[in-house]
């Protein structure tokens, strides 16, 4: 089965072709980072308009890359939610218009299911079941993944997502957009232990997260720098140490909770997905801690940690392979800006 995947939930337009026999044939992505940088965040209306401009050129690109003709495609998968309503509508409309013109069925995909399944795109994918750490700008969750469509929430953030905390910390420190990669880069130049920040809910006894207090601790520390009248090189060193303290605290919590989830479920495999899953400090800490305890950790390719069409095409192929009745051939569709992953069933 050959599936075209279309991702448009936020500020990346992604298209890809996935074949159940040959794997990922082609994927192309356009990021809107440069467009939103002047605003310090994603502007929904601009995001929607840009998806309209980018989708068809990206389609032509993946078709040319793979030598695929429209007659070769069996179905079209699109991100149905969650995400920005306007952005979702653009992707859904394009998917259904193509499907109508080409006489193909469609299937709507949960964006987070795409992330959960994205590590299956590697050459040696992890077998089910596994624990998944889904960590991104909008979500931080630990899930038990028994099979496609069989997901149990083990823990989740009670306030800010980890990626959101990274972005807000970057803004507090005075870094550019997008903040997550910038604060991580700065942290690598900081001195370990120079600034020690709290590890929220580290010993809470459950698998939930909280990152708002960590963000507040960063703000408090910045006020101390201001009161001390730090400037110039001294201020830059202090900011680097603060970034290091923040990243170390966030990573410690993510690692500890992930290991606790593996222990609770008695599973041996952890899958890490979502944009923050590309963070080098998190990958290194998780891999080291897991290896000491005999656990395996699986990551998607770095290029597939961000939102992308490949994960949507894969999820569509897996769903249609198991449940052909989910194929929609009447081209009526809805989008779901809010959509609980735990409610998703086969």
Curated annotation (Swiss-Prot):
It is found in: Cytoplasm. Its EC number is 2.3.1.234. Transmembrane segments: none annotated. Keywords: Acyltransferase, Cytoplasm, Iron, Metal-binding, Transferase, tRNA processing. CDD domains: ASKHA_NBD_TsaD_bac. It comes from Burkholderia cenocepacia (strain HI2424). GO terms for cellular component: cytoplasm. It catalyses: L-threonylcarbamoyladenylate + adenosine(37) in tRNA = N(6)-L-threonylcarbamoyladenosine(37) in tRNA + AMP + H(+). InterPro entries: ATPase_NBD (IPR043129), Gcp-like_dom (IPR000905), KAE1/TsaD (IPR017861), TsaD (IPR022450). This is tRNA N6-adenosine threonylcarbamoyltransferase. One of its GO terms (biological process) is tRNA threonylcarbamoyladenosine modification. The gene is tsaD. Gene3D superfamilies: 3.30.420.40.
């Amino acid at each position: 089965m050959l599936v075209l995947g279309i991702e448009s939930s936020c500020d990346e337009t992604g298209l890809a072709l996935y074949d159940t026999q040959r794997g990922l044939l082609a994927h192309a992505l356009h990021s809107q980072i440069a467009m939103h940088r002047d605003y310090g965040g994603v502007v929904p209306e601009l995001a929607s308009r840009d998806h309209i401009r980018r989708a068809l050129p990206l389609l032509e690109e993946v078709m040319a890359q793979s030598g695929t003709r429209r007659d070769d495609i069996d179905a079209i998968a699109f991100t149905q939610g969650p995400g920005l309503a306007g952005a979702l509508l653009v992707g859904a409309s394009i998917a259904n218009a193509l499907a109508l013109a080409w006489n193909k069925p469609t299937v709507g995909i949960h964006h987070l299911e795409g992330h959960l399944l994205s590590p299956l795109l590697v050459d040696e994918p992890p077998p089910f079941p596994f624990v998944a750490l889904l960590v991104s700008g909008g979500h931080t969750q630990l899930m038990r993944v028994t099979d496609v469509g069989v997901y149990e929430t083990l823990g989740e953030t009670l306030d800010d997502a980890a990626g959101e905390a990274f972005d807000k910390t970057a803004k507090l420190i005075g870094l550019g957009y997008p903040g997550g990669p910038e604060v991580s880069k700065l942290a690598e130049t900081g001195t370990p232990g120079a600034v020690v920040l709290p590890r929220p809910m580290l010993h809470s006894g459950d698998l939930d997260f909280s990152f708002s207090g960590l963000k507040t601790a960063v703000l408090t520390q910045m006020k101390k720098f201001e009161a001390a009248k730090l400037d110039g090189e001294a201020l830059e060193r202090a900011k680097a140490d603060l970034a290091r303290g923040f990243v170390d605290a966030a990573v410690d919590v993510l690692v500890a909770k992930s290991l606790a989830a593996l222990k609770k479920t008695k599973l041996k495999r952890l899958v890490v997905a979502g944009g923050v899953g590309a963070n080098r400090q998190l990958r290194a800490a998780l891999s080291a801690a897991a290896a000491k305890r005999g656990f395996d950790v699986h990551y998607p390719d770095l290029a597939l940690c961000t939102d992308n069409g490949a994960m949507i095409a894969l999820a569509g192929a897996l769903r249609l392979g198991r449940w052909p009745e989910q194929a929609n051939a009447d081209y009526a569709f809805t989008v779901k800006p809010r959509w609980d992953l735990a409610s998703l069933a086969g």
